[in-house]
Amino acid sequence: MAGYTKRELSIIDTAYRIFIRSVSKVMDAEQIGYIDKAYDLALSKYDGRKTMSGGLYVLSLIEMADIAANEIGLRSKTVVGIFLHRITAVSDVSLDYIKEHFGERIALIVDGYDKISNIQTNNVSFQSEQFRKLYLSLIDDIRVVLIKIIHRLYDMRHKNDVDAKSFKRYLKEVKYLCIPIVHRLGLYELKKELEEKVMIYEYPDEFEDIKRKIRVSSTEQEKLMEGFLEPIRNALDNEHIDYHVKWRTKSIPSIYEKM
């Protein structure tokens, strides 16, 4: 691994160890070993590769793996898929090698990711039913879509890692493909973040204006809700009914959409 400096290897190793400690509570030794194997291959094949902003590409994979395992709650096969999802496209690693060393399911995930990444999106609208059908017809495993969504979430969080032309296309992909899918999967926190990222990049002034107004009016909103809930709580208490009240402010994109 001549492409890394000693300091870079130390940074990567520290980040990976932190990640492994975080997932060792929910994954057994066999699953951790499976992830280690994929990470080692990625570390070797992405030898010294950098992102556009100058960061280490392997660190971006570790962050994506963390999103998968710790933010969404996905398991070892998805994490392995993340470490390997572009490896056949950018290195000499073949699908046969992936199948032999990681199993047929991971090979299908890697192949599926390559297929959806190779769709010529310049010739088809992201909003069209034709595109959605084409996209889904190429997928044999839902984890392919989840890895794509995780990768796009990473891109939205790290705009400087992506060139301007690609980022513009990724925004459309997030808006018309990723967000509807995560909504159907019930991943509402992820949906909220993706919607907010899209609005921040498309309508930054409007986003900040609504955010400011929410902050200014938050105390008044809380008083209003408490006044509304008080008679409901009293009625429930009188009937000795156990309950838990939840309420939330609508997301900024949702507020903007209704303006």
Protein language model features and the residues they cover:
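Active-site helical microenvironments for divalent-metal-assisted chemistry
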Residues: M1-M259
